[in-house]
Amino acid sequence: MHTFSHDARNLTLDAKAGGCFCERLPDGGGVEHMRVVYASPGKLLRLSGAIGPLQEAALAGTMTWNLSQAGGGTTVELIYTVGGFRAGGFRDIPTVVDGVLRGQLTRLKALVETGRPDGGSR
């Protein structure tokens, strides 16, 4: 889990327009990772913000979660687009961010299918 507090239980998402994807920190502080800009329950969730270390640069990001019904289940499509200025450029960023997001999607799939984010038995 990639969080500043190293504990996913500190993450919250208020999935409505203007809602916060936020994290409580152990010292009483907090982090606003992203802000919800579009919410259509069961269909689409769009957030705006630069996640993780991208917050330190002059970047803007948009993350879109598209949900669609398929074969008795749900297909999840995640798109995260980032632009702006970053000292040193972007060469190393896409691979790292894609890897983190892919890992989170893998954990989400395991949670839905097994009830545990690590995919283990209950």
Task: List each model region and its residues.
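A short, polar/proline- and glycine-enriched secondary-structure boundary/capping micro-motif
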Residues: 33-35, 56-60, 86-91
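A generic structural micro-feature
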Residues: 13, 28-30, 55-59, 70-72
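Short, conserved beta-turn/loop elements at beta-strand boundaries and strand-helix junctions
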Residues: 40-45, 72
